[in-house]
Amino acid sequence: MSNESNNTSQDQVEEAVTPEIVVDEASLMDELTQANFRIEELEQLLAESETALAERKDVEMRAAAETQNIRTRAAKDVEQARKFALEKFANELLPVIDNMERALQGTNPEDEATKAIYEGVELTMKGFLTSVEKFGVTQVNPQGQAFNPEHHQAIGMQPSAEYPANTVMMVMQKGYLLNDRLLRPAMVMVSQGGGSVDVEA
């Protein structure tokens, strides 16, 4: 009987343990499935975070590049503004220079009565031109040079045996540049070249 009672108690122990094992396996499978879902969720969140981080880095790099471009443009604009700040002032000085040139042209340097005036105007004009050159204003006097539409304004064309075609034969009014930028074009008469053209038969 003791053997039977041992068998009975062993059967009872096995019956009691077996449901626990089955319950444990089911709960483990359940936990494993939940863990797998959680891993997938975390991997998806990680991928989204990495994508967002890459996008933010890209936006940050673009913003830094744009900031650098703005700084470069601003520095260039400041340099241009400083370089050409005198443009209006220089334009106002050009008629004064023109008037001094006309005074020189209208005065005879050989005549004793006007010689002193001529020399005074000439010295004043040289000093004036030297002063404006220090600020980047230079004369455009294209006498005898090829016609350049960027710096010259043609008033007309005339035939000339002395000057080849498209050459400035007369400067009516000198032009001026401010730091290599045109302030006023030179008013010029352009040569058409010789009056006759040889034609071969």
Curated annotation (Swiss-Prot):
Function: Participates actively in the response to hyperosmotic and heat shock by preventing the aggregation of stress-denatured proteins, in association with DnaK and GrpE. It is the nucleotide exchange factor for DnaK and may function as a thermosensor. Unfolded proteins bind initially to DnaJ; upon interaction with the DnaJ-bound protein, DnaK hydrolyzes its bound ATP, resulting in the formation of a stable complex. GrpE releases ADP from DnaK; ATP binding to DnaK triggers the release of the substrate protein, thus completing the reaction cycle.
Gene Ontology BP, a term: protein folding
Keyword hit for Chaperone: yes
Gene: grpE
Protein's cellular compartments: Cytoplasm
Family annotation (InterPro entries): GrpE, GrpE_coiled_coil, GrpE_head
Predominant location: cytoplasm
Superkingdom to which the source organism belongs: Bacteria
One Gene Ontology cellular component: cytosol
Alphabetical list of HAMAP family matching this protein: GrpE
Assembly notes: Homodimer.
GO molecular function: adenyl-nucleotide exchange factor activity; protein homodimerization activity; protein-folding chaperone binding; unfolded protein binding
UniProt entry tagged with the keyword Cytoplasm: yes
Protein family (similarity comment): Belongs to the GrpE family.
Pfam families: GrpE
Keywords: Chaperone, Cytoplasm, Stress response
Protein name: Protein GrpE
NCBIfam families attached to this UniProt entry: PRK14139.1 (NF010737), PRK14140.1 (NF010738), PRK14150.1 (NF010748)
Upper classification of the organism: Bacteria, Pseudomonadati, Pseudomonadota, Gammaproteobacteria, Alteromonadales
